Amino acid sequence: MKYTRVLLKLSGEALMGSQGYGIDPEIVHSIAEDVAKVVASGTQLAIVVGGGNIFRGLKGSAAGMDRATADYVGMLATVMNAITLQDGLERAGVPTRVQTAIAMQEVAEPYIRRKAMRHLEKGRVVVFGAGCGNPFFTTDTTAALRAAEINADVVFKATKVDGVYDKDPAKHPDAVKHDHLSYQDVLSGELGVMDATAISLCKENNIPIVVFDLFEPGNIGKAVAGEPIGSRIGNPV
């Protein structure tokens, strides 16, 4: 099964590679090359990017910042990542538009659903920045929301691990990977894949989620082609 329209969720942490902070140009280049191949095959691709490599609202809140203020700072961090991704994608020959949920017309278009869909139909990648524009909502929830709005076939959550495990594989060598999970399995199991709001939105709109390793070259293309990589979350077959 080949997906026609895909929403790719990238965490901010994924962009920093092994640096511990900021953006690794090599990672951006690698992602751009993979995305270029996928778009050339005819797949429509939208991206939601996080901002945790620059600023994380929850950490700011824990350090004493007002939670809403911290979340707004985090949203601005996602815009920095979105513009950086746009640059990398366009250098790889992929026409790209950035749309933000907070207006900043000098650097990006405002988020307009119908315009985003038109860009996708014309073969452009759309990178969504500034989360959903509201504090207290994660970028995972934004990914689920935008996927529903643009009628995406699937949400890809590209991460540092190759799927969903019953416990953290970095800490537990005996962790077991799940190939298939229902939305309810994730909600009741507290597996930490996405927050409950994001999972619930996907469940309500019957949008499957595929979790896979971003750093394995070609994985985005394999996921688009429907190859059995990572872990798939959806309704029971």
UniProtKB/Swiss-Prot annotation:
The known regulators of its activity are described as: Allosterically activated by GTP. Inhibited by UTP.
Reaction catalysed by this enzyme: UMP + ATP = UDP + ADP
Q: Where in or outside the cell is it found?
A: Cytoplasm
Instruction: Report the InterPro entries cross-referenced here.
Output: AceGlu_kinase-like_sf (IPR036393), Asp/Glu/Uridylate_kinase (IPR001048), Uridylate_kinase (IPR011817), Uridylate_kinase_bac (IPR015963)
Keyword list (alphabetical) reads: Allosteric enzyme, ATP-binding, Cytoplasm, Kinase, Nucleotide-binding, Pyrimidine biosynthesis, Transferase
**Gene Ontology MF terms:** ATP binding; UMP kinase activity
What domain of life does the native source organism fall in? Bacteria
- What Gene3D superfamilies does this protein map onto? Acetylglutamate kinase-like (3.40.1160.10)
Instruction: Kindly list the positions annotated as binding ATP.
Output: 9-12, 52, 56, 159, 165, 168
Query: What are the record's GO terms for cellular component?
Result: cytoplasm
GO BP annotation list:
'de novo' CTP biosynthetic process; UDP biosynthetic process
Enzyme nomenclature, EC number: 2.7.4.22
User: Which pathway is it part of?
Assistant: Pyrimidine metabolism; CTP biosynthesis via de novo pathway; UDP from UMP (UMPK route): step 1/1
Write out the transmembrane intervals.
Answer: none
Q: Which residues bind UMP?
A: 51, 71, 132-139
Q: Name the NCBIfam families on file.
A: pyrH_bact (TIGR02075)
Concerning HAMAP family, the annotation shows: PyrH_B
Query: What this chain does, per the record?
Result: Catalyzes the reversible phosphorylation of UMP to UDP.
Query: Which family does the UniProt entry place this protein in?
Result: Belongs to the UMP kinase family.
Its quaternary organisation is: Homohexamer.
* Name assigned to this protein: Uridylate kinase
